[in-house]
Design a protein with these regions (language model features):
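Non-heme Fe(II) oxygenase metal-center motifs and adjacent flexible, charged/small-residue loops
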Residues: 1-204
Length: 204
């Protein structure tokens, strides 16, 4: 399951060209694309996100008690202005690049703030809405300290880990949300990281 490089046209923005993006076939119609250092000016973007996103601390029911969600979150819905211009540029560039495969634009931008190594997200697929029944895409841009995104086949099997660094782009496509799960595991030591996840309409 090695990454294979393919060449694409450059987007008409200040973002890095899509040339050199690498696709990894996972099986069962699932794949991931990886492009290192796609977003420029990442220190400025990270600082803006920390300061201006209206972060929320959520709680969820687990058995008979409420527990804190181990990260801060916020989702920019359709029509909401994104907190930094490059995020809108990234959304539009992703839409243009993937439209032949996806067939629709990226519409929402979910943000997760992992404050340190204790913050995490458990194994899951984005299967609320159409992701449960249709092939779709979720595009993730990472800002801040490197963290590993782990993936494993749904129902069990060998897992893989992809370290996402400052400005890196990872796109999960095809059947990935239905046939695979992903997670950001806890680690002993890590600095702050923010991920921005672009999704089409009605994929969560």
């Amino acid at each position: 399951m090695d990454f294979q490089s393919t060449l694409f046209e450059a987007p008409a923005t200040g973002l890095r060209s899509f040339a050199g993006i690498e696709r990894r076939e996972l099986g069962s119609g699932a794949w991931v694309d990886l492009l290192r250092s796609w977003v420029p000016g990442t220190d400025d973007v990270f600082a803006t996100l920390v300061a201006e996103v209206p972060w929320r601390a959520e709680r969820r029911q687990m058995y008979d008690r409420l527990v804190d969600v181990p990260r801060l979150v916020y989702t920019y819905m359709i029509g909401e202005e994104l907190p930094h211009p490059v995020l809108a540029e990234a959304r539009d560039a992703l839409t243009e690049h993937y439209l032949p495969e996806l067939g629709e634009p990226f519409r929402t931008a979910g943000c997760c703030y992992y404050r340190d190594g204790r913050d995490s997200v458990a194994w899951h697929g984005d299967r609320i809405g159409r992701g449960n029944t249709h092939d779709t895409m979720v595009a993730i841009v990472s800002f801040g300290d490197p963290r590993k995104l782990a993936l494993r086949p749904r129902g069990g099997g060998e897992s893989i880990a992809i370290e996402m660094g400052h400005g890196d782009l990872l796109v999960m496509g095809g059947s990935c949300q239905r046939t695979w799960e992903h997670a950001v595991p806890k680690v002993a030591t890590a600095g702050p990281r923010i991920s921005v996840q672009y999704r089409p309409f009605n994929v969560f």
